[in-house]
Curated annotation (Swiss-Prot):
Any coiled-coil regions, as ranges: none
Pfam families per UniProt: Ribosomal_L28
Annotated family: Belongs to the bacterial ribosomal protein bL28 family.
Entry keywords, A to Z: Ribonucleoprotein, Ribosomal protein
Protein's UniProt name: Large ribosomal subunit protein bL28
Organism listed in the record: Prochlorococcus marinus (strain MIT 9312)
GO biological process: translation
Taxon lineage: Bacteria, Bacillati, Cyanobacteriota, Cyanophyceae, Synechococcales
GO cellular component, one term: ribonucleoprotein complex
Entries under NCBIfam families matching the protein: L28 (TIGR00009)
Length: 78
């Protein structure tokens, strides 16, 4: 199961963990993904999506259909 947002394509970021003594080690910063069942008004059906919490906040503000179109995602495949 890949940890990629199905609406935005957001995926893990490579970062550094820095200790108190300033020793740096590589760290993988994962996306906060949630499995959500969202109502798609235009298609008149429920859509099951793995979505990041940042994208979920935008969907609640703008709407699922408008947000998906702005990101070039076809909701018919879900």
């Amino acid at each position: 199961m890949s940890r990629v947002c199905e609406l935005t394509g957001a995926k893990a970021n490579n970062g550094m963990a820095v200790s108190h003594s300033h020793i740096r080690t590589k760290k993988l910063q994962q996306v906060n993904l949630q499995k959500r069942r969202l109502w798609w008004e235009e298609g008149k059906k429920w859509v099951n999506i793995k979505i990041s919490t940042k994208a979920l906040k935008s969907v609640q503000k703008v709407g699922l259909d408008k947000f998906a179109k702005s990101n070039g995602v076809d909701l018919k495949k879900f």
